[in-house]
């Protein structure tokens, strides 16, 4: 099972997903950001993979390791946007197609996740309590995406997440 969330602003998005997820899971994170206070320990605790963004060879190794672990039953959270924008107002950035190589290699279902208002926690000028929402969308089974290129899979997942965010934003106006 691959959970594809969006807007990896910080480890708190991962915590929101892990808190609401029914099974233990891990995640892939930028190596530089993984060595901050408490984040390092959390990454070690859940055996997160640390990705060196400027090292393609290491990226391929991580993709292969995660694909093997997912095929064996481990669950991972991936953030295909590959970064974040300050105060993004729930806008979805373009997805990096390479993230979806893991799904193709492991034949795992892809579970799109729509995170709503998570950016407000640390990446906006909002003051006061914040309620964030985590929506797990219908899984995309391997049979549905097996003949697609990674960019086509990325586009499919992105569209489903954008539609859910738009639907929820209209419902809560």
Protein language model annotation of sequence segments:
Residues 62-66:
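Anionic-ligand binding region
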Residues 1-55:
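Catalytic core of membrane glycerolipid acyltransferases/transacylases, capturing the structured
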């Amino acid at each position: 099972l691959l959970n594809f969330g969006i807007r990896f602003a910080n480890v708190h998005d991962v915590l929101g997903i892990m808190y609401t997820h029914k099974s233990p899971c891990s995640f892939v994170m930028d190596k530089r950001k993984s060595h901050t206070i408490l984040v390092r320990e959390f990454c070690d605790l859940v055996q997160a993979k640390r990705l060196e963004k400027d090292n393609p060879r290491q990226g391929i190794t991580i993709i292969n390791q995660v694909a093997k672990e997912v095929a064996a039953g481990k669950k991972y959270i991936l953030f295909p946007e590959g970064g974040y924008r300050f105060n993004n107002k729930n806008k979805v950035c373009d997805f990096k197609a390479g993230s979806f190589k893991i799904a193709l290699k492991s034949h795992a279902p892809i579970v799109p996740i729509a995170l709503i208002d998570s950016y407000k926690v640390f990446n906006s000028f909002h003051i006061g309590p914040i309620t964030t929402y985590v929506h797990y969308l219908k899984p995309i089974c391997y049979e549905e995406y097996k003949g697609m290129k990674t960019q086509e899979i990325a586009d499919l997942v992105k569209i489903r997440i954008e539609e859910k965010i738009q639907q929820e934003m209209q419902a809560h106006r």
